[in-house]
Amino acid sequence: MLKRMRDDIKMVFEQDPAARSTLEVITTYAGLHAVWSHLIAHKLYNQKKYVAARAISQISRFFTGIEIHPGAKIGKRLFIDHGMGVVIGETCTIGDNVTIYQGVTLGGTGKERGKRHPDIGDNVLIAAGAKVLGNIKINSNVNIGANSVVLQSVPSYSTVVGIPGHIVKQDGVRVGKTFDHRHLPDPIYEQIKHLERQLEKTRNGEIQDDYII
């Protein structure tokens, strides 16, 4: 347990340039508190002490803003940066050396029982606001862009962006747009621009029908 905690603290220093001291990390990093609380909750969950496990999970959620179901299986050195709004579902599994930013959801797609949440491999980065949904596999060494919605499994050494998520880089070779948060697809903006073009055509007499969408 102590080795696990030391490894988690080391991961914070490796991933966050704002971390200045061990005391600061231990006392002020909500992501660390959520992960350590989950270790206790998960142990109780495996002992079928479900109420106690959920109670610890809820208390942790209240203080950290991070919701991790006690049934979730989490590997070593998980770093949750900022953390507010992160949700990790019951049947989710997370490998080692994973970094998750605020607003990320690792959730299901419906009310089905059984395995319904994603499996996350090792060395994965999931950027702010991304949603990874359903019983899918995110293999190792994957980057998922901010606000992406991933609904299908992703092979190793890939970069995924967009809604729905699509691969833009695989095995170091670019297959689409670069992994740059400034240039992620914005479906709402694209729809507005489409409507503006349709309205302009209507004004110019190119479209006669009143229904332009």
UniProtKB/Swiss-Prot annotation:
The first-level EC class reads: transferase
- Which BP terms in the Gene Ontology apply to this protein? cysteine biosynthetic process from serine
Fetch the InterPro entries from UniProt: Hexapep (IPR001451), LbH_SAT (IPR045304), Ser_AcTrfase_N_sf (IPR042122), Ser_O-AcTrfase (IPR005881), Serine_acetyltransferase (IPR053376), Trimer_LpxA-like_sf (IPR011004)
Superkingdom? Bacteria
Among Pfam families, the record links this protein to: Hexapep (PF00132)
The entry sums up its family as follows: Belongs to the transferase hexapeptide repeat family.
Q: What is this protein called?
A: Serine acetyltransferase
Q: Which organism is it from?
A: Staphylococcus aureus (strain Mu50 / ATCC 700699)
Q: Top-down, what is the taxonomic lineage of the species of origin?
A: Bacteria, Bacillati, Bacillota, Bacilli, Bacillales
Gene from which the chain derives: cysE
